Amino acid sequence: MTSILGSARPLIQVGPKSRNASTSMSRLPSFPTTRPCRRAPCSSSSYATISPTAPRSSQRNPTNASRHPRIDEVDHIPTSALGRVLLTAGSALGLLNNPSRGDLLSMLTQVSSGPSLAHLLESMRSTESGRRLLIERPSVNSETVDVDYLASLERGKFGREWIEWLKDNGVGPDGRAEADYMTTLEHKYLIQRYRESHDFYHLLLRMPVTQLGETVVKYFELAQMNMPVAGFAAAGGTLRILASSLSALPKPSQLISAALNRSPAPETAHQPPSSADLSALQTLIPWAMQVGSSSVPLISIEWERCWERDIEEMRREFRITSPPIQVAKFSGRAKKGGKRRGWPSKILEHQKAQHQQQQQQQKVDESRN
């Protein structure tokens, strides 16, 4: 090694005598290597293939390179920002014209829920029951609920009162459309749980499925969950109640003719229902907003574990006070085309079918005897 360095020393010159240094370097002795070094080819796409979820289209299109799908992303209907705005406006106007359109309500809930999803997710993660819901993801419908068992509970229990409320209002938990616009499993379950819990809010707030009751519940949801769909529905319900109240007023022509004839203006024996709803709404809105802002996050409640609990105890625990006035119960929906308008109720259909089966079985037993 010393001989090599000694022979190489006069070849590498410094200072002013190094003008031919580049040519002298070619005469340096070469050292043979035992393993040839091969340089691996490097391409711009080798970094993109590190992530197994990165689409190949993002390697060629730099505009989509920053968009990587989440691991829990599910099949959904893709929408752009402009598309969501148009769907929000269209579904809101459609619901204002016909509030019984459940498909429009589901669409409005999904396409407008973007700003509030983080708040809902934070509310569920803040409690142990909410975190358990996000892991187990149970559902409330006629296939997961033992209707016969809940109907056998004594009055005052949450499960029994829920069944009685369904009977009184002619509704059920199965009229919920799929959340086809949500991109991830987590967001899809948030919307599903929000919609499945809506009837429980009615029950705890003592509100029927009427125009007044629905509007009050939407004000409650707006104060507690900041859901845009709750704001749209609350504003739409208020406008409809206000329009009904204005239409019940005497026409100007009637007032003028009554004044000219010096006859008393037409009076009703009692206050019209529309005017009564408007007066009740003015009283119930502050109460609903106050209860919504002070009660516990109901989105994280495991209703499946509350069937046998006392409903009044639950109201005290959730800090839900009684309404300042009593709201009239549901008296049935108007019929259109010979059919009653309303949400489908598979629970009531199940009870009716079971009753018919029992009657048929009794007839069979009697015929055998």
Swiss-Prot record:
Which PANTHER family does its entry note? UBIQUINONE BIOSYNTHESIS PROTEIN, UBIQUINONE BIOSYNTHESIS PROTEIN COQ4 HOMOLOG, MITOCHONDRIAL
Presequence range in chain numbering = 1-28
Q: Which cofactor does it need?
A: Zn(2+)
Q: Name one GO cellular component term.
A: mitochondrion
Q: Which reaction does it catalyse?
A: a 4-hydroxy-3-methoxy-5-(all-trans-polyprenyl)benzoate + H(+) = a 2-methoxy-6-(all-trans-polyprenyl)phenol + CO2
From the record, give the cysteines joined by S-S bonds.
none
Q: Which family does it belong to?
A: Belongs to the COQ4 family.
UniProt keyword list: Lyase, Membrane, Metal-binding, Mitochondrion, Mitochondrion inner membrane, Transit peptide, Ubiquinone biosynthesis, Zinc
Residue spans of biased composition, Basic residues class: 332-343
Species per Swiss-Prot/TrEMBL record: Mycosarcoma maydis (Corn smut fungus)
**Signal peptide (residue range):** none
Query: Polar residues: which segments have biased composition?
Result: 19-33, 47-66
What is this enzyme's EC?
4.1.1.130
Q: Does the keyword Metal-binding apply?
A: yes
State the compartments where it is located: Mitochondrion inner membrane
Q: How does the entry describe its membrane topology? A: Peripheral membrane protein
Q: Which residues form a coiled coil?
A: none
GO terms, biological process: ubiquinone biosynthetic process
* Superkingdom as given in the UniProt entry: Eukaryota
Task: Write the protein's name.
Answer: Ubiquinone biosynthesis protein COQ4, mitochondrial
